[in-house]
Amino acid sequence: MKTAMVVGGGIAGLAAAIGLRRVGWQVRVMERAAVLDDAGAGISVQANGMRALDVLGVGDAVRAVGAAQGGGGIRIPEGKWLSHMDAEAAARILGSPVYSFLRADLHRALRSALPADCLVTGVTVDEVVRTADLVVAADGVHSRRRAQLFPDHPGAVYAGTTVVRGVTSAPVQTEVDIDQTWGHGAEFGSTRLLDGRVEWHAAYNAAEGVRHDDLLSEMARRFGHWHAPIPALLAATEPGAVLHHDVYELRTPLPAYVADRVVLVGDAAHAMTPHLGQGASQALEDAVCLAAYLGSEATIDEALIRFDRERRPRTQAVVGAARQTGRIGQQLQGRFAVALRNAGIRITPSSAAVKAMVKYALWEPPALG
């Protein structure tokens, strides 16, 4: 039986392990944290990610802990709508709505698909040592494996955006399922969770590394005067349910996702800004494609060559599209520039938003052998 070592026990690593086991590999997941991640706020998975989960055999289990998202749109801080998303039309084309989860619930659903002895926690893999037929580097945006394989690559760089994420402690009534508000160099978004609580994020331009002693008070200062229900969402959130992190991306594309028999997946390969909401879905696509090619190609090397050939162009295009979306959306500053953008969005038909989503979420997964 072929063996694989997966470095990293996040969503990308767990999904890769599930896929490899489904095509007959023996897999061990190595995670630095002493306890596999139950932290985090919310996360959304688009139709392509849901199709990947179905191929991996965990789609139903994941849907059971997620909330299918209906309508939504973009508005300005005063509350006026710039555009609406026809979620039903998008779901008809894509075959699935967007699902939103507590990250911890999605993580647990993936973990439950793996035997306990597959997961090894509290270990640090300082360097890639070939003790398996394949090493899957799923160790995130600041991947050590990537740095070892491509020492001349500049690595992840700060994208100019910092993000605060929270989850309300009780259900909060919202007008739509997916609500996104664009201001000047700032964005506030929210999605409904399965139990009626709301996951929210506040993204804004800031210098790298700036932190605040009272994060919720800072959010109230920045966003408390924006339209309802934003003040209510902040008021319904406990300080312990708030996370703050800077956004990093691989602005310089990697020359390859494969070196010898080490393959990079997820953020280790193609870290992107969150402005398209495609990060998790692209990692899930990676997992399916890697397993499918290893199950169908004659040799491991041929499978990895195919993975690199097919995944690198698609994911790097998504990285670029996410960056561009952020530049014209959340990151845009200047009264004239913002007014021009808003006017352009108002006269754009709602079908354009559906087309923009479909461009990256429409994906036909390969079958697992």
Question: What is the predicted function of each stretch?
Answer:
Residues 21-41:
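Glycine-rich FAD pyrophosphate-binding loop
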Residues 12, 35, 142:
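Conserved Rossmann-like nucleotide-cofactor binding loop
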Residues 2-4, 21, 46-150, 154-167, ...:
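Conserved N-terminal helical subregion
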Residues 161-191:
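Flavin-dependent oxidoreductases
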Residues 1-12:
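Beta1/beta-strand and adjacent pyrophosphate-binding region of the FAD-binding site
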Residues 184-186, 194, 202-276, 282:
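FAD/FMN-dependent oxidoreductases across multiple families
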Residues 1-2, 64, 232, 276-277, ...:
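C-terminal helical "tail/cap" subdomain of flavin- and related membrane-associated enzymes
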